[in-house]
């Protein structure tokens, strides 16, 4: 459920792996976590940290790739988010030495999240933890000799939020842009989109091309040489169905003159 998905020490995680023989979603109970309550100080005695577990599975999957077949990995890391929770290891302890105890985040939304003391240290630690995950992914690709022939994209889903009492201005997270998550101003929808493709995407290049995530599929289709993708993936049972995405391959390759652009970006938000 959405509530468990928003916790870093959840009661369960869902798995669906055809390679493991799954025919549907499998609920994996976090046996060590459920020994302790979801609220109160004992919550932090839970040991099965979802972000670490997701990253562990991602690394195991990369380790199985041998370069003989194309592969596609979509790693949906959840760091950082509204809940402030993580192992009290060297990452967090290092930040606790540099950030003061301040107002608590959490405990103010009907006790949806457990409150913590070192809120900014916790948030900084979660960002550093994510950074370490990305570094491990890149090192694993290099270790297996796959890094020069693999496109790596790092991005986010939305701008900064206020859930749980978070302060979007701290760390300069708002980038001085107007708007927050769920809003259509730049602050809500303008996010990092970093691409690493050695020998094809120029290092350090910055481009202001506007795109949305539905542009990723046609981009990958073009890179694979599948030029018929717009006709293949429309629903012929729906009148006037169309393919909204536009490939941004020209932008990646530095050929802005050939880049087709959106007249506008459109999506719907349901929650």
Predicted regions and their residues:
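Active-site-proximal cap/lid insertion segments
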Residues: 2-217, 221-242
């Amino acid at each position: 459920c959405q509530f468990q998905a928003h916790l870093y020490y959840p009661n369960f995680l869902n798995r669906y792996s055809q390679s493991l023989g799954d025919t549907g979603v499998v609920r994996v109970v976090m046996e060590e976590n459920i020994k302790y309550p979801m609220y109160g100080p004992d919550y932090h005695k839970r040991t099965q940290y979802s972000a670490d577990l997701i990253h562990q599975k991602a690394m195991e999957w990369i380790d199985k790739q041998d370069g003989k077949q194309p592969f596609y990995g979509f790693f949906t890391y959840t760091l950082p988010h509204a809940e402030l929770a993580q192992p009290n290891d060297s990452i967090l302890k290092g930040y606790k030495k540099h950030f003061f105890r301040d107002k608590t985040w959490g405990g103010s939304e009907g006790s949806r999240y457990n409150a913590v003391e070192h809120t900014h240290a916790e948030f900084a630690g979660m960002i550093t933890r994510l950074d370490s995950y990305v570094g491990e992914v890149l090192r694993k690709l290099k270790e297996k000799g796959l890094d020069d022939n693999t496109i790596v994209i790092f991005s986010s889903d939305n701008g900064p939020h206020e859930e749980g009492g978070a302060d979007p201005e701290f760390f300069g997270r708002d980038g001085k842009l107007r708007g927050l998550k769920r809003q259509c101003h730049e602050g809500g929808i303008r996010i990092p989109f970093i691409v690493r493709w050695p020998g094809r995407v120029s290092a350090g290049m910055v481009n202001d091309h506007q795109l949305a995530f539905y542009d990723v599929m046609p981009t990958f289709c073009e890179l694979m040489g599948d030029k018929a993708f717009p006709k293949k993936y429309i629903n012929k049972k729906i009148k006037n169905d169309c393919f909204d995405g536009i490939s941004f391959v020209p932008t990646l390759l530095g050929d802005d003159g050939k880049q087709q652009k959106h007249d506008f970006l459109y999506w719907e938000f349901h929650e």
